[in-house]
Amino acid sequence: MAEASGELYFLSEIDPETQNFTKYVKIGIVKNDRSTESRIDEHQTGNPREIRDLKVILSPRVRKLERLLHGVFERQCVGGEWFEFGEETLTEAINFAIEQAAELCGLEEIVSEVENFAKTESTEEEVPSDENARDLARRFHFLHQNEKKLKAVIGDVNKKIADVEDDKIGKDLLSADERLTERKTIFPKPSFKKADFKSQELDLYLNFCEISTEVKQKTLSINKDIKNDAGESTSFFPEWNQEYDEISKLIVETSELIDSSSPEAVFENLMVNRCELTKFQSLYDFRKTNFEYRLKHACGLASGIKGVCTWKRSLIEKEVFDETKFKEEHPDKHAEYTKTGESYQRTFVGRGNRRPVIY
């Protein structure tokens, strides 16, 4: 399903005393069924400071653009969608948003065609490879692998920060209200275990099934030789060399901070590094998705590109189980196979300190 287009906005407030914009800026979106003006009206309700837009940018896949901006400027975040910007950084953020929106606009037709390809059974043929296809595949694989690495390091940082805060709270050096992290136990909602029901009572299960056909796509798979070519080297991508060097040093430094015997002393550095890691992870995720669309577009209706990648879409028969009807006719049996999954813990890190409220 196509991601919605819309407007990415930069909003700020007028200081009632100076009549100038404050340093706090909200970066958010409205999808194509709404307008920034209506969003401002909603924010204005009960707010004594006048809210105005600093910049509004039209963009396809606008949610993707918003996530990118929030990640890249994580260090300036003061809570939620609010950021503290000096004039220079604000200009940088707006110009960056305009550039990335242009990238998304340039891909709009490609994305639309790829979404149509995804609904169509692929042929048995493979497209002949060329240097452009190999370059797309190398870049996609490089970004995909390093984005996963960044995400893993961020997870380790989150756990370490939470451990340090737990220790500080235990020593009365930090109150629970001041902590930036939150450990949550996630309790999955009860769900009907269709597979268990099918394996135990197949005949009854089939009474509530219909067979339908649909096109199912497999994950885009990169050829082993291309993976070996790309590896973790940026030799194919000189424009990313400096950035990749920064990331490599940042990961090494962050790992040393995590392993530090005095974690409290490096707490602030961990927070700073987390923001930098998040910036690069957001960039890599954004680029990876765009290169994936380009590579799939190069596949077209074929099942892949010879020696480069495969992207198969097959017409399959699918059992469609009518759970609603089954529950109505067999409520006790439905309850018997409705179970709650095992709970698990997740660590969340707040996005900056909350913006001061001025009345």
Q: What kind of region is each of these model predictions?
A:
Residues G155-D203, N241, T289-E292, K296-A335, ...:
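Extended, charge-rich alpha-helical interface modules
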Residues L277-L283:
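Extended, low-complexity amphipathic alpha-helical repeat segments
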Residues M1-D167, L174, P188-V266, K279, ...:
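Non-catalytic accessory segments flanking enzymatic or RNA/DNA-binding domains
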